């Protein structure tokens, strides 16, 4: 009994030392996936038991344990004797600090800012008083997926096979590819719209959906549509994701019917052929009108047909003959006209001179200057009306002597040629 009692007394005396006086709240180990460029808080809140409220100093250390085989520990932040110190990791000195202004107030958490892929490691928090407590956080920093490229391969006609291609040229592996039909007649492929691992809106959680897409064998980003038809029309969205983010691209599938396309092409070609024939016919009519405009009748000097029809003067200067079949009023030899003129105070001779000046023929020129000039005869005319036939032919310009002869030619039936 004496030996047993002594042993029991020894265990009672040593029990406070065997108990942990410093305790850190939370799990002993945490795994985190973080995106490049983000900020994170690595928690390390702790408690001190009454046995540890003595005068012993409080020491806090944060160290980085690399995943190398050596598992080298690098202390990068400390708190000792109410002083904060930075360790031997210069690339972390400007990006890490304690979350609390006084870490001795039961909070040894730190803020790590502007994360880099090289920050992937295991971070360990150690709080020492009379005893020591530790906590580890496994941090994996990844780059978000780059914006992918989407395209199709294959002819989009009814009954053919089409491959939808999707590829992201950036982002940390592993990358998962998920296709979803976002518009059209049906939705055979379910889409998951999410911005981060904490806001994944779907029937499945973010992690479950991520691993399920990997198991579906869509790692290469290809989706095969076999024997496409009108039901496959629509927009297809490719989502590239990893543990820290996602990116999307959209491609359109529009199935065409080969027979319908042939009909449309035939209709277009037929319309063009009809338009060409119509234009050719109009051009032929214009050429015929310009070339045979004189068939409707003879044209005068100014392009007007005298015997019927209007000549096309714009189509060319053609020689023409003018035939006037009209009866001119006769000039009777009675003295009634002379009496009227005497009554009006105009002698016959003066009237003849005034008319001669008014209706004098123009100077001799080309064929286009020929004109018919009515003139009152000074001599006596034969009684009774009689038809007058005048035939004017294009000729070379006459000289002035001929003009004088025409001026002095005797009149017949009251008209001067």
UniProtKB/Swiss-Prot annotation:
Among PROSITE patterns, the record links this protein to: IG_LIKE
Ig-like V-type domain span = 22-140, 145-256
> Topological domain, Extracellular: which ranges?
22-262
According to the UniProt record, which cysteines are disulfide-bonded?
Answer: 44-125, 166-238
Q: Membrane side Cytoplasmic: which residues?
A: 284-417
Q: Which Pfam families match?
A: Ig_3, V-set
Membrane topology term reads:
Single-pass type I membrane protein
Keywords linked to the UniProt accession: Disulfide bond, Immunoglobulin domain, Membrane, Repeat, Signal, Transmembrane, Transmembrane helix
In its UniProt entry, what is this protein called?
V-set and immunoglobulin domain-containing protein 8
This protein's species is Mus musculus (Mouse)
What taxonomic lineage is listed for the species of origin? Eukaryota, Metazoa, Chordata, Craniata, Vertebrata
Query: What is this protein's gene name?
Result: Vsig8
